[in-house]
A protein has these predicted regions:
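Leucine-rich tandem repeat or coiled-coil scaffolds
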Residues: 1-392
Length: 392
């Protein structure tokens, strides 16, 4: 686990690192090996990166010197590529400040990966300025950076004015209910944003009450991951009501929250009118048989949902049977996968599954006892425009 956010270390050591990097650049250095955990994603480059490459390197090194940051050799090698992968590099706030200036005018980078760099609020705030001005970056990963309220406020404000951004990952940043208002404003203002990852945060029921109405009004988002949070009670219900009114979202992951039976019932109501959603993950949400039956009321009429995952819920075989029965009673159902993993079912359920298979031959039903192979067709939710030579 990365240490709490603090100011950078000894300035003299950092300045020595900057000076050494500048010296290597001036003398046409031998490329230094990148020590990233995901080194396969780094681009090994030799010499100058083409026309203007030396200028870009110089801008970065001067920025490092100005902000007392140690240069990242991987940045120097990837600065002219469509994908800049600097995850797990321990850049910290100072390293983020040093990156901001060269990124502002960089015409090449489309995907920026800064996951797990201890950027903190100050570092994200510095990068936000660059992202607000960038006309090329459309995919950014700022997960696991302890950004806090300061960081999320800055990044949401920046993305609101940058309409080129299509995919944003903010997972694992300990975002709480105070961050919800800024996230809601982003959902309301940015119609070009297609994919948003808010998983592994601490968004509570109050956050759900704020995000729900914003989701209802959003006119662009097609994929939302808000799994591993604390949405429950009235917040879960409010969030589900937002889903009911939304007409763009196609993939939703709300697994590992606390929707419970009231939340499941609200999702069931949403599925009655929502004719866009195709994938829904509700795993581990404290849904009992009662909640499963309420959810089934929506499945009786829904015609677009293709994948429903409800594993690890205390709904027992009774709840699974009720959900499957609702699907059977809907001749227009589009379901291809019903996932009840790690839930024990009985012989009666197996018999029903066999009869439903006759009516809906494309449907795969997965339980604790029956594992099935299902290869879903990837939805074209977000496909970055990378050249064929760059691995996706």
């Amino acid at each position: 686990m990365r240490a709490p956010c603090k100011r950078s270390g000894e300035k003299e050591e950092q300045e020595e690192g900057v000076a050494a990097a500048a010296g290597r650049l001036a003398g046409a250095p031998e490329a230094e090996e990148c020590s990233d955990v995901d080194s396969d994603s780094d681009r090994e480059m030799e010499g100058i990166h083409g026309p203007g490459g030396l200028v870009k390197d110089t801008v970065y090194l001067r920025s490092c010197q100005a902000h007392s940051g140690v240069p990242a050799s991987c940045f120097l090698r990837q600065v002219s590529t469509p994908e800049l992968n600097l995850r797990h590099h321990g850049l910290g706030p100072q390293g983020a400040r040093a990156l901001a200036s060269p990124l502002t005018s960089n015409p090449y980078v489309k995907r920026l990966d800064l996951r797990d760099n201890g950027l903190c609020g100050a570092g994200v705030e510095a990068l936000a300025g660059a992202l607000s001005k960038s006309s090329t970056i459309c995919d950014v990963d700022l997960s696991e950076n302890q950004m806090g309220v300061v960081g999320v406020q800055a990044i949401c404000a920046a993305l609101t004015v940058n309409l080129t951004m299509q995919k944003v990952q903010l997972a694992g940043n300990s975002l709480e209910e105070h961050a919800a208002q800024y996230l809601a404003e982003l959902l309301l203002a940015h119609t070009g944003l297609k994919s948003l990852d808010l998983s592994y945060n601490q968004l509570t029921d109050h956050a759900g009450e704020i995000l729900g109405p914003a989701l209802a009004e959003n006119t662009g988002l097609t994929e939302l991951n808000i799994s591993w949070n604390h949405l429950r009670g009235p917040g879960a219900v409010a969030f589900a009501r937002g889903l009911e009114a939304n007409i763009f979202l196609r993939v939703l992951d709300i697994s590992y929250n606390g929707f419970g039976d009231p939340g499941a019932s609200a999702v069931g109501e949403a599925l009655k009118t929502n004719n866009v959603l195709e994938e829904l993950n509700m795993s581990n949400n404290r849904i009992s048989a009662v909640g499963a039956l309420s959810l089934g009321l929506g499945l009786r009429v829904n015609q677009t949902l293709r994948i429903l995952v409800m594993s690890r819920n205390p709904m027992r075989g009774e709840g699974c049977f009720g959900v499957l029965k609702s699907v059977r009673d809907n001749p227009m159902s589009a379901l291809e996968l019903l996932d009840f993993s790690e839930i024990q079912v009985d012989r009666e359920f197996d018999d029903l599954a066999s009869s439903v298979k006759v009516l809906l031959p494309a449907l795969h039903v997965k339980t604790a006892a029956h594992r099935v192979e299902y290869r879903k067709e990837l939805l074209p939710v977000f496909t970055p425009s990378l050249p064929a030579s760059v691995p996706k």
